[in-house]
């Protein structure tokens, strides 16, 4: 495992990317939105210590029930993954990443809705929301004009917003295992 970590460090160095991977590999989990704990309950990572130049932040497979985006001062963040946690709602502070975020992965949580602020992420190209409890998507979703990939599989969606037809760059829409009766018309 140490060799793999070294390889990731070398890859990040070679490509100029800075990745902070806070996914537990030892059974650890997050107990609150501010730090992650190791398997013994000790603090393993304090999010305020995350390098401000980080472009990728991976917080998958923890037990986060909430996540306050204002605690992160990451203006260069391109990829944020919070998959496989216990998030029930998304903090509207997500809009603070509007100038940089291109990939947002939130699958396998307990999200019931998304704040309208999600639609302010104008550079977003990939949005994964599968395996949640979403009953609807924001009406303004069509404002994500750069969106290429949208996954909303395994939710409770009865309809997709009509503005979805405005996503002219959308290459992949995956909406399997929902309660859909019709698709919005293309515009």
Residue ranges and their predicted role:
Residues 1-131, 135-139, 148-153, 159-162, ...:
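The feature captures the LRR N-terminal capping module
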């Amino acid at each position: 495992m140490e060799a793999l970590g070294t390889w990731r460090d070398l890859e990040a160095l070679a490509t100029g990317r800075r990745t902070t991977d806070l996914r537990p590999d030892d059974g650890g989990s997050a107990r609150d939105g501010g730090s992650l704990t190791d398997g013994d309950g000790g603090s393993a990572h304090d999010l305020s210590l995350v390098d401000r130049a980080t472009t990728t932040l991976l917080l998958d497979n923890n037990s986060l029930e909430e996540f306050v985006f204002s605690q992160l001062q990451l203006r260069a963040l391109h990829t944020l993954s919070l998959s496989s946690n216990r998030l029930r709602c998304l903090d509207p502070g997500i809009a603070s990443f509007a100038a940089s975020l291109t990939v947002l992965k939130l699958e396998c949580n307990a999200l019931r809705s998304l704040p309208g602020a999600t639609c302010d992420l104008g550079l977003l190209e990939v949005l994964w929301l599968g395996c949640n409890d979403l009953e609807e998507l924001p009406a303004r979703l069509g404002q994500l004009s750069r969106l290429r990939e949208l996954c909303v599989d395994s939710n409770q969606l009865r309809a997709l917003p009509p503005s979805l037809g405005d996503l002219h760059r959308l290459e992949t829409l995956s909406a399997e295992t929902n309660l859909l009766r019709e698709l919005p018309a293309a515009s």
